[in-house]
């Protein structure tokens, strides 16, 4: 598995980011013209998307934006930022046996309570496991941090996982760490204390917490290692 990559949709344009218009739309210079780029990741991405940063995007066939942001190119790494692919990545890790060996993906976006989780798994003994997947693109001093912007929805997901565990389900949260220099994962207490507290409570309630480090190359995603987790303030 260490030498296997998950193929990514290959971008067809390289550009220079100029500014963010709103949560999901930015402007980049591509091919000598200013183009609208769809940004699927709702986070701030402030350390990645700033005037002058180099981006990779693929052409869209429909919609108000002509391009879809795939990755940001830093001096020494590519950072994959297409959050729409997180479930696919987690499914690949599970089906490959790297994460939760012996489990298989039974369903995507299973309903639970008043909402949905990302994956429903079936374990080696027939047990059901609910999984929530989060992508991590913020790294500070070797520490991968989530979230990079306050997320009421993320905190609610942790609370729902804790309830699922209390109801007898096996429950997991998987953090996909997409930064090369990350050596440990932590919740971002400074940015979103509510989420950090909800994650810590979920862990104490029996929710399994995983952090998986991945590296982006042109154009595939490679599993690197499982990172230690520090939930302390």
Swiss-Prot record:
**InterPro entries in the cross-refs:** SfsA, SfsA_C, SfsA_N
Q: Which GO terms describe its molecular function?
A: DNA binding
Pfam families from the xrefs?
SfsA, SfsA_N
Q: Where is the signal peptide?
A: none
State the Gene3D superfamilies in the record.
Answer: 2.40.50.580, 3.40.1350.60
The entry sums up its family as follows:
Belongs to the SfsA family.
Q: Which HAMAP family match?
A: SfsA
Q: Any idea what this protein is called?
A: Sugar fermentation stimulation protein homolog
UniProt organism field: Pyrobaculum neutrophilum (strain DSM 2338 / JCM 9278 / NBRC 100436 / V24Sta)
């Amino acid at each position: 598995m260490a030498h296997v990559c998950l193929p990514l949709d290959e971008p067809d344009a390289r550009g220079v980011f100029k500014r963010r218009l709103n949560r999901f739309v930015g402007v980049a210079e591509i091919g000598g013209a200013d183009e609208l780029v769809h940004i699927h990741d709702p986070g701030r991405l402030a350390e990645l998307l700033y005037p002058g940063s180099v981006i990779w995007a693929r052409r869209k066939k429909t919609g108000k934006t002509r391009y879809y942001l795939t990755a940001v190119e830093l001096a020494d790494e590519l950072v994959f930022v297409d959050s729409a692919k997180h479930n696919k990545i987690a499914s690949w890790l599970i089906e490959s046996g790297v994460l939760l060996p012996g489990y298989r993906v039974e369903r995507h976006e299973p309903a639970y309570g008043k909402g949905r989780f990302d994956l429903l798994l079936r374990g080696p003994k027939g047990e059901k496991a609910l999984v929530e997947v989060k992508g991590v693109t913020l790294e500070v001093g070797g520490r991968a941090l989530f979230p990079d912007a306050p997320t009421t929805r993320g905190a609610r997901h942790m609370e729902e996982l804790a309830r699922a565990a209390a109801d007898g389900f096996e429950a997991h949260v998987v953090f996909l760490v997409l930064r090369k220099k990350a050596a440990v994962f932590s919740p971002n207490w400074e940015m979103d204390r509510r989420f950090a507290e909800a994650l810590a409570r979920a862990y104490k309630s029996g929710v399994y917490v995983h952090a998986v480090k991945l590296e982006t190359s042109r154009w595939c995603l490679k599993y690197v290692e499982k990172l230690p987790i520090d939930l302390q303030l």
